[in-house]
């Protein structure tokens, strides 16, 4: 049970750190952290939790990562559903805490997005469904390929969290304008269910695309990686 608790708290921290920075700090006039700050917040959230709970659960913090690790032969199917449930619940708990904080400011507007992921008119840059799909599939695929490589037996030990955190930062720098960056169904669900309406109606993409990308990334790594990994 400890590994499920670790995934709960790890995903809680990822959503609070990443989405919290987007909701509370990104748009502050003059002192706002902007896209770069949000990207760093997501990367740092994963990096810190990877060191904290990696030895307990592997610090997946993401249903797509869990699926990808299973496809890559690094994770048992029997633990897949409990991990995903723990991740989603942790994300939702963080979304609730973030809502309590954000709603304490006068003029707070939940309908403005609450760091939700979207496409079309709900894309930060007005990108289409097709662009959002390609972005999420490709970037999640590369994320999994790097995760599998960085955690392989041949990789330098102790550096995987840094590689993974920096990768997630780069992914956000690329795709915040496209979809607000998901690559993580739990992160998307964590805020979409509070916004409701369009955020929920578009949520399907941010489950389908990251999981598809994770599967493709894991299969790609199996082609180039060591079979004994």
From Swiss-Prot:
GO cellular component, one term: plasma membrane
Site label Selectivity filter, positions: 42, 172, 181, 187
Coiled-coil intervals, chain numbering: none
Keyword Transmembrane among UniProt keywords: yes
InterPro entries in alphabetical order: Aquaporin-like (IPR023271), Aquaporin_transptr (IPR034294), Aquaporin_Z (IPR023743), MIP (IPR000425), MIP_CS (IPR022357)
Function of the molecule: Channel that permits osmotically driven movement of water in both directions. It is involved in the osmoregulation and in the maintenance of cell turgor during volume expansion in rapidly growing cells. It mediates rapid entry or exit of water in response to abrupt changes in osmolarity.
Family: Belongs to the MIP/aquaporin (TC 1.A.8) family.
Name of the featured protein: Aquaporin Z
Source organism per UniProt: Pseudomonas aeruginosa (strain ATCC 15692 / DSM 22644 / CIP 104116 / JCM 14847 / LMG 12228 / 1C / PRS 101 / PAO1)
Phylogenetic placement of the source organism: Bacteria, Pseudomonadati, Pseudomonadota, Gammaproteobacteria, Pseudomonadales
């Amino acid at each position: 049970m400890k590994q499920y608790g670790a995934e709960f708290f790890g995903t809680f921290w990822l959503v609070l750190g990443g989405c919290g920075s987007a909701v509370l700090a990104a748009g502050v006039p003059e002192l706002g952290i902007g896209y770069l700050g949000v990207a760093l917040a997501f990367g740092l959230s994963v990096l810190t939790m990877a060191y904290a709970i990696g030895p307990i659960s592997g610090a997946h913090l993401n249903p797509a990562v869990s699926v990808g690790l299973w496809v890559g032969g690094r994770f048992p199917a029997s633990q897949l559903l409990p991990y995903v449930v723990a991740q989603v619940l942790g994300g939702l708990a963080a979304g609730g805490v973030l809502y309590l904080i954000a709603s304490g400011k006068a003029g707070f507007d939940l309908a403005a997005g609450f760091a939700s992921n979207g496409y079309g008119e709900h894309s930060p840059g007005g990108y289409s469904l097709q662009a959002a799909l390609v972005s999420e599939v490709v970037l999640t695929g590369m994320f999994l390929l790097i995760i599998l490589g960085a955690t392989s037996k041949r990789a330098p030990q102790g550096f995987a969290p840094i590689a993974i955190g920096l990768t997630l930062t780069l992914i956000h720098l690329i795709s915040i304008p496209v979809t607000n960056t998901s690559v993580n169904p739990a992160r998307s669900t964590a805020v979409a269910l509070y916004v409701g309406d369009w955020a929920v109606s578009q949520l399907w993409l941010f489950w389908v695309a990251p999981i598809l990308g994770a599967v493709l990334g894991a299969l790609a790594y199996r082609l180039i990686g060591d079979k004994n990994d």
